[in-house]
UniProtKB/Swiss-Prot annotation:
Pathway: Carbohydrate degradation; pentose phosphate pathway; D-glyceraldehyde 3-phosphate and beta-D-fructose 6-phosphate from D-ribose 5-phosphate and D-xylulose 5-phosphate (non-oxidative stage): step 2/3. Homodimer. Its EC number is 2.2.1.2. It catalyses: D-sedoheptulose 7-phosphate + D-glyceraldehyde 3-phosphate = D-erythrose 4-phosphate + beta-D-fructose 6-phosphate. This is Transaldolase. It is an enzyme of class 2 (transferase). HAMAP family: Transaldolase_1 (MF_00492).
Length: 317
């Protein structure tokens, strides 16, 4: 009998949601995703110390300004960790733009190009990189511009249907709708504390987005993210991609049995509606209290961890 991780791989591209190289070697995912929190965690791993030292040495050569050195070193560290991961996976690494730029399209584009340049200078072509941006209106506009210039993007912190629709309409390469954080909100804000996988609000959200994309012929890849349990993952089997943390990859690899396809679409392609404009986007997004709160909360948390990373680098400079 096969294990559930192996069975899941037949239906869905499995991505590792970690910056931990040991986990990459163990689970051999197709792609990997990182974010400021994961980079901060990875930076605590002793084997990564040389990557930090190298990033700091490089940053010192780029500028005499201490403030600029901190920014440069944190960019270079994220790329250095990405380069190590790319040695272990056949596909793509997702590297995130500073969350503090989430409401600034112009600076998000500039930061994305900076990260791409660092990868290119290390010999990595654009087709192995995804630039992660928060799914704000400004982040989506930045992604739209980057996609036109041949830089594929992964739109993250996606909680509302309006965000998903706007991403598809912008021609974004991939979205990361968050499953577990949606569940967290409903547990905290409703009387119901337990949800079966098929009634999990995060699972329902991703299922609706997946079906809408397929029904309207959008090429944007749907990659479910932020899982709280393996039941959520199995309920989304068949989704284009799923990015899974090492603890849940381990759980799936140790569970025996075939995984049943839950998502798929073989129907006719429907006409697409007119794209949302900015006013419509904000109106629809803000009708969803969960999405409004979780997007702001997610940006704050990533910004805090980016600040912690920069403080760590500052102490070493």
């Amino acid at each position: 009998m096969t294990d559930k991780l192996t069975s899941l791989r037949k239906l869905t591209t499995v991505v590792a949601d970690t910056g931990d190289i040991a986990a990459m070697k163990l689970y051999q995912p197709q792609d990997a995703t990182t974010n400021p929190s994961l980079i901060l965690n990875a930076a605590q791993i002793p084997e990564y110390r040389k990557l930090i030292d190298e990033a700091i040495a490089w940053a010192r050569e780029q500028s005499d300004s201490r403030e600029q050195q901190i920014v440069d070193a944190s960019d270079k560290l994220a790329v250095n960790i990405g380069l190590e991961i790319l040695k272990l996976i056949p596909g793509r690494i997702s590297t995130e733009v500073d969350a503090r730029l989430s409401y600034d399209s112009e600076r998000s584009v500039a930061k994305a190009k900076r990260l791409i340049k660092l990868y290119n200078e290390a010999g990595i072509s654009n087709d192995r990189i995804l630039i992660k941006l928060a799914s704000t209106w400004q982040g989506i506009r930045a992604a739209e511009q980057l996609e036109k210039e041949g830089i594929n993007c992964n739109l993250t912190l996606l909680f509302s249907f309006a965000q998903a629709r706007a991403c598809a309409e912008a021609g974004v390469y991939l979205i990361s709708p968050f499953v577990g954080r949606i569940l967290d909100w409903y547990k905290a804000n409703s009387d119901q504390k337990e949800f079966a996988p098929h009634e999990d609000p995060g699972v329902i959200s991703v299922t609706e987005i997946y079906q809408y994309y397929k029904q309207h012929g959008y090429d944007t890849v749907v990659m479910g993210a932020s899982f709280r349990n393996s039941g959520e993952i199995l309920e989304l089997a068949g989704c284009d991609r799923l990015t899974i943390a090492p603890a849940l990859l381990k759980e799936l690899s140790e569970a025996q049995g075939e995984v049943e396809r839950k998502l798929g679409y073989a129907g006719e392609i429907k006409a697409r509606p007119e794209p949302l404009n900015e006013a419509q986007f904000y109106w629809e997004h803000h009708q969803d209290a969960m999405a409004t709160e979780k997007l702001a909360d997610g940006i704050r948390k990533f910004a805090i961890d980016q600040g912690k990373l920069e403080k760590m680098i500052s102490d070493l400079l």
